[in-house]
């Protein structure tokens, strides 16, 4: 059941207020999309109370945190699922009926979040649901794709693939967490400098994007617990180069913005050509680097000794795509935290766990050494 006593009249008033404040309309004038958004924001208000309570409880308990890293999460529609897990579906259905709103029509209005495609993504979503229901402290970590893969239309008897613009009207269940944004660097070269008698590897000449997290609630079934799916969007560090634009170099003026947008456009871009292989590698490194950076920063908010990182954090790597987390954690521990290689490797081994989904060679993703060297950030790899 809902943690607090459900008040039908308060819920109905909140729906009406959301329609008014979001769209400057009366309830009876609202479209189905506007009603869906208004009701979803009302439900999110209920969820947020439990979300805050959950995070406060975790902070007091200081449990080990699982970061479930996956290229995809096939979550399904959120409105009905959240209400079922809150134990509030029947009560909300009744309240909406009194407003003349059909809850089934609202559920049909919601697009499927285009964050996953098949069994790999569905398994990831099921794990997140189970972790919340069992009361484990966990984050899902992935990419906030703008178009996912595609949606199908049948025209003249043939399948036509078109972009799945699931974010066209926004996602009412997500919260942008700009305060946790981090920089992710690609390419460049490495200078070796001496600091306090130690070699320090300094990356220079790189391209970078700003990784911005969006949090979605994962509601546990009947237990008031709400965990987090954190999906990362890419933004340009500098959106617009006015100097290039004034020189007539219009493509160069938006080069950084285009780089950022490309990273999060689609799930599994075609990799039959080199540009596609490069984009996939960038996608994987992008969300892994952002997630690892944030996990370390969160750990250091309450713990002083990075050498005990593995005692409080586990990275669960869902198939081959996120395995670059091993290299990224090593890079940060050695280059930024100043640990020796063997010590960092021991921590990394105890932190990273891997889920294998197949033994077929053609399904196990690989990256050529030559291709990887083009994007390496260590001169001695």
List where the protein language model places each region.
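Function-dense linear segments that define catalytic or interfacial modules
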Residues: 65-101, 223-314
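Well-ordered mid-protein domain cores that form the structural environment of catalytic cofactors
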Residues: 85-125
């Amino acid at each position: 059941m809902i943690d607090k006593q459900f008040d039908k009249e308060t819920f109905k008033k909140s729906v009406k207020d959301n329609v008014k404040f979001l769209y400057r309309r009366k309830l009876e004038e609202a479209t189905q999309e506007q009603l869906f958004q208004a009701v979803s924001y009302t439900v999110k208000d209920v969820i947020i109370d439990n979300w805050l309570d959950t995070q406060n409880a975790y902070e007091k308990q200081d449990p080990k945190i699982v970061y479930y890293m996956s290229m995809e999460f096939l979550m399904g529609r959120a409105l009905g699922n959240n209400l079922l897990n809150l134990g509030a579906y029947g009560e909300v259905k009744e309240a909406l009926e009194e407003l003349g709103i059909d809850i089934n029509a609202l559920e049909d209005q919601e697009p499927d979040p285009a964050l996953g495609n098949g069994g790999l993504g569905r398994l990831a979503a099921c794990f997140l649901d189970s972790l919340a229901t069992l009361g484990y402290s966990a984050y899902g970590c992935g990419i906030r794709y703008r178009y996912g893969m595609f949606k199908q239309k049948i025209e003249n008897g043939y399948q036509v693939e078109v972009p799945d613009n699931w974010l066209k009207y926004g996602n009412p269940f997500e919260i942008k967490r700009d305060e946790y944004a981090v920089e992710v660097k690609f390419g460049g070269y490495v200078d070796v400098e001496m600091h306090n008698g130690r070699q320090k590897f300094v990356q220079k000449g790189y391209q970078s994007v700003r990784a911005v997290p969006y949090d979605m609630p994962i509601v546990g079934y009947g237990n008031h617990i709400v965990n987090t799916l954190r999906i990362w969007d890419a933004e340009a560090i500098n959106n617009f180069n006015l100097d290039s634009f004034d020189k007539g170099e219009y493509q160069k003026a938006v080069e950084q913005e285009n780089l950022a947008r490309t990273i999060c456009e689609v799930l599994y871009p075609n990799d039959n050509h080199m540009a596609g292989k490069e984009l996939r590698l960038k996608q994987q490194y992008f969300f892994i680097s952002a997630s690892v950076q944030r996990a370390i920063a969160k750990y250091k908010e309450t713990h002083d000794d990075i050498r005990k990182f593995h005692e409080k954090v586990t990275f669960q790597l869902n198939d081959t795509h996120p395995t670059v987390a091993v290299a990224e954690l090593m890079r940060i521990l050695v280059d930024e935290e100043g640990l020796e290689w063997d010590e960092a490797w021991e921590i990394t081994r105890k932190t990273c766990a891997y889920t294998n989904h197949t033994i077929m060679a053609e399904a196990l993703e690989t990256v050529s050494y030559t291709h990887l060297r083009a994007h390496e950030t260590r001169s001695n790899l």
